[in-house]
């Protein structure tokens, strides 16, 4: 079991991956990598935000007084990593809007996730993020 993510441009391409044996009681991880340059997509507030954030999340993020375009990019990447981990665990696709941003604490983001399918799945997910010179990397973990 494992995961992969990549980001590229005309000049360079980067990938991040992991692989491990799967046992039923182990944690499930999801990873994502984004170019820090992609923050420009988040500088202009438009309908793009509505694709991955509900209105309440947008209001909560605006209260944080951080570099908001950069924070939006980190949250987008974190949700991508959660979607990947969720699929590995449950073999289901989850919508961005079913993953709700809760809090930012240092290098960690916290989310509340709810998926209604054959069974209702409700989780709290912790996502670690860090950056290199040019990329943002997020790693989510779903506990078994």
Language-model segment annotations:
Residues 1-144:
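Conserved nucleotide-ligand handling architecture
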